[in-house]
Amino acid sequence: MCIRDRRSTQYDSNRSGFYWNDHIRAEQNAISDFEFDKKTAKALLEQGIGLVNTHIKDGVVRGTGALIALDLNGDEGTRILSNKSGQYLSLSRSIQSRQTYPTSIMGSMALLRQLYYDADWYEKGNIKNTDLTLEAFNQNTNLTQIFAAGSRANAIRADKVGDQFDIQYTILGGGDEFERIEAIKNTNATFIIPINFPKPYDVEDPFLADRLELESMREWNQRPANLSALENNEVPFAITMQGLKSPKSFKTNILSAIEQGLSKSEALKALTTVPAQILKNDKVGNLKKGSFANFMITSGDFFESNATVLEHWVRGSRHIFEDLTQKDIRGTYSFIAENDSLILEINGSKHKPLSLIHI
């Protein structure tokens, strides 16, 4: 039996006092829905992440984001570094609205262009009624404009919209920029690049292997080299963990990118100074006088697989993961137990030793 969906098509906005299209939500502020999760924050700190920039991922225009310090010992007053860290845009509809338009990427681009014209008209006082969306949109134009493109094709499309209105977007890419690297470079944009690389395919099953497409294999093979391609072509970028299912994959995937040619110095910049520049915040991403005391103490070179985070300081607040005062007991020891001579061998790491007794 088939049950017909009797919901009528929605053409107009169902919000009063806001923009005529519900997929434009410039009045949203991420800080309004912010809740600090200590468990998640601790997991991020252990992986070397001390600050998080977040926003509401919903709509063609998504409102403002928030920059949060992951201080487990502080409160909201010290954790919130910026309650308006940027204005966020995309080509995706809002899940909060059933309004029909736009129905395609091209429709989203047309809607965005119309928004810029309407915002300019509104700012010049040509509209008597108050529009809370346009007011918020105009107020946020002095912030960094971050466009969630999600692919190299959409990045180029977004840049064309920005060029039309003399706006240089910072573009959240899709990790496939290497496929159109010249066009990506010509955008003159700073990119935010995800490192959610595809996992290896299981080719032991001949049936599944036969169905595996060459394009998918190429993507799996080449995506870790994307950051190296950006570096070699002098495209500025920051690294994001967006799209990763586990914080533990963050460093693992960075090391994969380094194996594929990304320099350690560029990786460090992509995690520190470049994000700070994107967010126009000179108190983070560096250790200069007057900046926040944000730094890590590690067991070795952070970009080595066996290096661990021993301590993570956020705004001068200390978070200890492994005790620096712990003595190194690794070595080989001989002792006698019940008249038997035994050898005790302790190896492993200093903070996680492993023991083996030889009889």
Language-model regions, residue ranges each:
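Conserved small/polar residues in nucleotide/adenosyl-binding loops
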Residues: 1-5, 357-359
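Metal-associated gating/positioning segment near the N- to mid-region
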Residues: 4-55
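Short, charged, surface-exposed secondary-structure boundary motifs
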Residues: 7, 180-183, 200-207, 308
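His/Asp/Glu-enriched, well-ordered alpha-helical/loop segment
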Residues: 15-19, 25-27, 144, 190-298
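Polyanionic/metal-chelating signatures
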Residues: 36-178, 282, 302, 308, ...
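Glycine-enriched alpha-helix->loop->beta-strand junction motifs that scaffold or abut catalytic
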Residues: 162-168, 186-192, 236
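C-terminal cap of metal-dependent C-N hydrolases
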Residues: 292-325
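Tryptophan-anchored aromatic micro-motifs
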Residues: 325-343, 351-356
